[in-house]
Swiss-Prot record:
GO terms for molecular function: 1,4-alpha-oligoglucan phosphorylase activity; thymidine phosphorylase activity. InterPro entries: Glycosyl_Trfase_fam3, Glycosyl_Trfase_fam3_N_dom, Glycosyl_Trfase_fam3_N_dom_sf, Nuc_phospho_transferase, PYNP-like_C_sf, PYNP_C, Pyrmidine_PPas_bac/euk, Pyrmidine_PPase_CS. PROSITE patterns: THYMID_PHOSPHORYLASE. This is Thymidine phosphorylase. GO terms for cellular component: cytosol. The keyword Transmembrane helix does not apply. The enzymes which catalyze the reversible phosphorolysis of pyrimidine nucleosides are involved in the degradation of these compounds and in their utilization as carbon and energy sources, or in the rescue of pyrimidine bases for nucleotide synthesis. It catalyses: thymidine + phosphate = 2-deoxy-alpha-D-ribose 1-phosphate + thymine. The keyword Transferase applies. SUPFAM superfamilies: Nucleoside phosphorylase/phosphoribosyltransferase catalytic domain, Nucleoside phosphorylase/phosphoribosyltransferase N-terminal domain, Pyrimidine nucleoside phosphorylase C-terminal domain. The gene is deoA. HAMAP family: Thymid_phosp (MF_01628). Belongs to the thymidine/pyrimidine-nucleoside phosphorylase family. GO terms for biological process: pyrimidine nucleobase metabolic process; thymidine metabolic process.
Length: 439
């Protein structure tokens, strides 16, 4: 069928068959479908949506547009996590080694940051020598030898998604739930997983600010993943403040090393990381209950086995062998430090989390366009959480910048992002809801 006929069919509100969807995505991959046709298709889906069967067919067609990894030779279950993104979200750096040290295999294919949210791959790139985009042979070696590897999407995995996403990004169709769902899941299915846990963020630092939108996305992801044959569950977690007390690249890696080694563990970050670890372990069958998973993940973290696994992963993928012992020796440090100070007494009652992320972007630590270069050394540390008591002159955060002018600009954004009130607010739940496939 001609691409324009498939577009017209969806434009007029009709359901597309699996064959129509496969033919269109085949054209996206081969180049037979033009950018204009792909954009028109995305807009038709944006306005008319897709039902579960259509979204499953789209996901599978995008998965099959490239290679699908096979981990059947591994002597254990294969699992992964996907986060919809936020600020100070360095969970993957602790989660992958925790779950791997418990006996699962975690081939984690991650993305780069765009907009106000940070990207896991950019964080790993802050480690000197670390090969974040290895060939398949080195990727497999790292997973086999250490139990986990955090890498970027290769050219051979879900190439249709890469092209379609670039078109969506410039045509106002990024927010379409079926297209988001297929984009996320096609890459995860191409990674050859046996199970997947989704961390769907909600709040003023997330892409989904409203609970109903986050729930709709979580339900779509869970139902489509299940329809595609993947064991799946989702947690909806809060993003009304940064998850870690650091936001940036090198600073979040340092925060992750401190977490793994026990030097510093931010409470909300620990809650989310261990909840996701328990969920992943239960999904693999390595534990019989969520409680058992939580206990085992906590034990693996506190014993140092997770830190040792992270250290081995970094070394196998080209990073320093002593990185976990001496992160400050290797991580870039910005030349200017600037304390952001409270102007009044009280309690931190709210944080405009998106603005914290945008302050990092303004420092050079994020992207406004996909081809922007990142400075790994800049960022913000010692971010006070909601509920902290402050006095006028106390530090709310510490900005790390390339110049005093950059530091002052970021500090102005950060200080205006903090709301200070007379009463201590009630603590928000960090993990809000668990979503499973229906039936």
């Amino acid at each position: 069928m001609l691409p324009q006929e498939i577009i017209r069919h969806k434009r007029d509100g009709h359901r597309l068959s699996a064959g129509e969807i496969a033919a269109f995505i085949g054209g996206v991959t081969s180049g037979a479908v033009t950018d204009g046709q792909a954009a028109a298709f995305a807009m038709a889906v944006f306005f008319n949506g897709m039902n579960r069967d259509e979204a499953v067919a789209l996901t599978l067609a995008m998965r099959d547009s490239g290679d699908v990894l096979d981990w059947s030779d591994l002597p254990g279950p294969v699992t992964d996590k996907h986060s919809t993104g936020g600020v100070g979200d360095n969970v993957s750096l602790m989660l992958a080694p925790i779950v791997a040290a418990c006996g699962a295999y975690v081939p984690m294919i991650s993305g780069r940051g765009l907009g106000h949210t940070g990207g896991t791959l950019d964080k790993m790139d802050a480690i000197p020598g670390y090969i974040s985009q290895p060939d398949i042979a080195l990727f497999r070696q790292a997973v086999l030898e250490t139990g986990c590897a955090i890498i970027g999407q290769t050219a051979d995995l879900a190439p249709a998604d890469r092209r379609l996403y670039a078109i969506r990004d410039v045509t106002g169709t990024v927010e379409s739930v079926p297209l988001i769902t297929a984009s996320i899941l096609s890459k995860k299915l191409a990674a050859g997983l046996g199970s997947l846990v989704l961390d769907v963020k909600v709040g003023n630092g997330a892409f989904m600010e409203r609970s109903r939108d986050a729930t709709a996305l979580a339900n779509s992801l869970v139902e489509v993943a299940s329809g595609a044959g993947l064991k799946v569950s989702a947690l909806i977690t809060g993003m009304n403040e940064p998850l870690a007390s650091a936001a940036g690249n090198a600073v979040e890696v340092h925060n992750a090393v401190d977490f793994l080694t026990g030097r510093l563990r931010d409470r909300r970050l620990e809650d989310v990381t261990l909840a996701l670890a328990a969920e992943m372990l239960q999904s693999t069958g390595l534990v019989s209950s969520n409680q058992d998973g939580l206990r085992r993940a906590t034990e693996t973290l506190t014993s140092g086995r997770a830190a040792a696994t992270f250290a081995r992963m970094v070394a196998v993928l080209g990073g320093p062998a002593d990185f976990i012992e001496k992160p400050e020796k290797y991580l870039a440090v910005a030349p200017t430090e600037f304390a952001v100070r409270a102007t009044t007494d009280g309690f931190v009652t709210g944080i405009a989390t998106r603005d914290i992320g945008l302050a990092v972007v303004g420092l050079g630590g994020g992207r406004t366009r996909p081809d922007d270069k990142i400075d790994p050394s800049v960022g913000i540390t010692r971010l006070l959480p909601i509920g902290a008591e402050v006095h006028a002159g106390d530090a709310l955060a510490l900005v790390h910048a390339r110049s005093p002018a950059d530091a002052e600009a970021a500090a102005a954004t950060v200080v205006s992002a903090y709301a200070i009130g007379a009463s201590k607010p009630a603590a928000d739940k960090t993990v809000m809801r668990r979503i499973l496939p229906r039936g």
